[in-house]
């Protein structure tokens, strides 16, 4: 997948990738867990990043809810159901382009558990040719609305 600019359009969709939608709707949050389960059953990710992405996205959403912050995020991890030409905005995981409260959540997680969140281990990355600080779970923000049909196809395993 290659983007022309920081805010660009998907030129080519890669195979065997998963779209995870994060929204304020609880149904969408349940869909994230289900999509991770389906993909892990298929064995598409032997190293577990996909499961970590879902688990920690959910924990991050809970962290935001406790602070009264909105949870209308869209997380894109390895998606084959994106359409060419879809406009996206990408950011690094955790530290700079996503949000400061994600960074605080990772600090809290590390303090409480004694370990770094698996999806953000320092030895991960770089990914998709981004700079060396882009590690772990890659977060994309999709500006176009993702249709219900795409979510349904993913949930049905198509």
Regions inferred by a protein language model and the residue ranges of each:
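Short, Lys/Arg-rich flexible segments
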Residues: 1-158
